[in-house]
């Protein structure tokens, strides 16, 4: 078994930072296609967000602001860039904050963290997070399945 999840984990730090900041302007530009983000980031030139200083200058969106935006513009406050037909689940975190779960195999990126913690394909992951409106159970399950693991909640009763 490889020691690392993929080659991204063994990149030279300077290369990693260069690649991350090269993508950051694309991420900011995509966020600004949502009306809530466009308003929050008004005056920001996405193409200029290419350094730590530029990142630090972006306005912070606080959890309380998200909750207020979602009350004003349900369900996502104008912050969602995922098309409605691409949303697998509508989840709710404490706040309350409503969150869309997209349709990707490991939407939350949890497989990488599980791998770093020593979880490997074929392992059984005991997932004791809730599966109600909160995302915890779904987040762990998607990462376990992306790694090729069974999570305890998906196993048939013996």
Label each residue range with its predicted role.
Residues 1-116, 120-122:
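Nucleotide 5′-phosphate-binding alpha/beta core
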Residues 116-147, 151:
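Conserved AMP-binding loop of ANL adenylate-forming enzymes
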Residues 151-158:
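ATP-dependent adenylate-forming carboxylate-activation enzymes
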